[in-house]
Amino acid sequence: MKREKILLIDGHSILSRAFYGVPFLNNKEGIPTNGIYGFLNILFKEIELEETEYVAVAFDVPKPTFRHKLFPEYKGTRKGMPEELKEQVPLLQELLRKMHMPLLMMEGFEADDILGTVAKQMQAEGKEVVVVSGDRDLLQLSDEHIKISIPKTSKGETKVYSYYPKDVEEEWGVSPIEFIDLKALMGDSSDNIPGVPGMGEKTATWIIQKYKSIEEAYAHAEDPEFKVPRKPSAGKDLKENFELAKLSKELATINIHVPISLNFSDCKWENYANSESKELIRKWEFRSLYSRFEEAESTAEKKLSLPAWKDVEDPYLAKIAFKDAKKQKSAGIFLQADPSDGGKLYVYLCLSDTRLYRIPLSLCEEELTELLKEGEYFTLQLKDQYHLWEELLEGEIHDLSLGAYLLNPLKDSYAYDDLARDYMDLVLPGKKELQNTAEEGLYSAFVSWQAKNRIFQELKDTEQWELYRDVEEPLVPVLFRMEKAGILVDKEALLSYGEELKKNIAMLQEEIYSMAGEEFNINSPQQLGGILFEKMQLPGGKKTKTGYSTAVDVLEKLQEDYPIVGKILEYRTYSKLNSTYAEGLSNYVGEDQRIHGSFQQMVTATGRLSSTEPNLQNIPIRTEMGRVFRSVFIPKEGSVFLDADYSQVELRLLASLSKDEKLIEAYRKDADIHRVTASEVFHVPLEEVTPELRRNAKAVNFGIVYGISAFGLSEGLSISRQEAKEYIERYFTSYPKVKEYLDGEVAFAREHSFVKTLFGRRRPLPEIHASNFMRRSFSERVAMNAPIQGTAADIIKKAMVIVDQKLSEKNCQSRIVLQIHDELLLEVVKEELETVKDILISAMEHVVSLPVPLIVEATVGNNWDEAH
């Protein structure tokens, strides 16, 4: 008869493994959750793998155990648990209780002892036992009907390694019970079990394989045949330290007689997905686990189903639906093409909790156009819908995805299921789980209607309503028009430059082969590292797991003394330019010879726009080769490019927000701010500031905006860390209110876990209290910079809205074609140049009133490079 199976889990061990194996996660409230998330994934994986219905979890109690009485220094060398991990222990225990899972804990004993006791008890009761732990100490429990399962999580993926007695012997060369003696000899630094001084794993294994126990080994330690290979003193070491070995054995032995028992039937894996557990899963935003909890939900609690919806094919019924919508002057709307129906466009209309329609656009264009003339409507991902049917521009349509983005800009998705979970407390199937395109449209219209009130209220509660209404929403049609217009490319010039690059790459390749004395794959870091640091014996080689590091910072230090390195860096530059720009850009040129990229409004945490397909914001500008690529972007015939760029916008904002009198005065006098800073920081008269001092001051000025450290500045300027530290200190002495302002932003972040821009945009900082120094320091730097960078993003977005509006009012044919952070590029009809230039400069400079005025530099050219 097949034995029933039970899963016994080492709670702290698996939580810890998961914490270090899963990238850091937190929910919108800043609660760290990666350990819990990883634990649950391991739990579900083990349950499926073992096909069991019985589970229990053991935890350590944060109090001394019997082992501490034996040896007060037990585990004394362990570092304290990181705060982010410690926080997750009670949260996980709360969740497991709500999942009706037995939690096993007892003062004076470790989880290992409880697991050992219960495992042996269950085996004696005729059960098959699987003990899940990240601790190999439990291998001693392995038995005929007790399997030890050790999961290892890396990069979010979990692999499970299983051990019955034969597996333990195969890997360690000893039986499970002998594993205790092995540890007694070699010790365990993680638990501060001393072992026999100087005795490593190989020596200990030889001894236990031959003598089976430390007691037997001790009895034969002086025998002539007690000859451990390459360790002649092993017998003597054991004799002299036998008391230590015995103590170590006692510490390493799992106590299987803990006064605890477990009722097998209490461990039944059922009703774990109930309203209480699901509430925590939603709160912690474990999106990928929602469906698992929903599927397991009891029949009394069903997954939300869509209200009955009508697939309208009758023109008369379509008119009735739109008549109802027009009467209430409000609806959830979503427009979508159905690829399974030849790309046919459908309108999804939600009028209430119970009235939901799918109507072919061809059946209701007139009605929809009429509907949009009055009232307000709600949708998701509005810009994508503009591309399907431009007439949507005529209506007052609110994009709730944008609102959700402002409320939590750290998320990577603002689809219907995200909004349902966050603002309706509903779990909906994700896009990949849907049966057809219609369901996505129906859910999107339904969620748009249902989530609107809560999203709008939260925008008001967080003082971001004006930002949403006056900046983000009006920007959507502007970005649509930019995408639709695209930017013209001289494809012939682009391909010609690509051919030139290929020739240079081929020539450099031959030169590198010649210098190396053989052919190899220059693009392979492993092969390149072998050539440079083994064959050619170049200094400074940093060995990694996969070979030598050939990162840019490593090679740049060698290029002056070793010509081959300079050629390699040049080769890499040309190769990247060719693949990313020459070939990459040409793939995006459409039949109209224009690139129609995408501008993403809901990607960055600071509010900056992001350019994709292709990324036109990162085309190099400071190199000659980068400028050549900019030159292939040209205006249409009869037009020119007008480029407007804010001058030092972030430094001007720093001066304005900090209210530092010296900085403000320098800008008001139109002084060279870098020369002024050099004079202040290096204590030299203004007229004696050298180009080098100005360069260093410039690095300090821009570095301060980004919360630069002494180390970062020293690396950037190739100076000592002490010098860099002094530069920063002198800067803050010269501009004390800047220091006061930046410290104030960090203090605000510590109190509120977010910072905000001048326009109220919030940048959450969930790791501002992280125990990990690197993560905490990064959050502090973001706290200093995000209000400045975010305000700059808000300013140019608002300027874009004004410029677009003014161009429309003046009936101009000119248009914005690109936004590159602090820069706008317009394709301007020559006859409109002066008018458009005035509109552009005025809008950008007067978008907000600040102590330090915003200054815009505008230039004209026949290609993008000329215009910049």
Explain the meaning of each model-derived region.
Residues 6-7, 11, 17-56, 72-73, ...:
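Conserved RNase H-like, two-metal-ion catalytic cores of nucleic-acid enzymes
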Residues 506-510, 514-565, 733-781, 785, ...:
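C-terminal polymerase-core module
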Residues 350-353, 401-430, 442-447, 601-685:
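Function-dense linear segments that define catalytic or interfacial modules
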Residues 155-159, 165-183, 307, 341-461, ...:
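Active-site-proximal helix-loop-helix substrate-binding element of RNase H-like nuclease domains
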Residues 2-4, 25-27, 76-257:
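Extended two-metal-dependent nuclease catalytic cores across DNA- and RNA-processing enzymes
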Residues 241-363, 376, 441-621, 634, ...:
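Conserved "right-hand" nucleotidyltransferase catalytic core of DNA-directed polymerases
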Residues 459-471, 475, 795, 799-820, ...:
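Active-site palm subdomain of RNA-directed nucleic acid polymerases
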Residues 484, 596-597, 601-604, 679-812, ...:
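Conserved catalytic core of nucleic-acid polymerases
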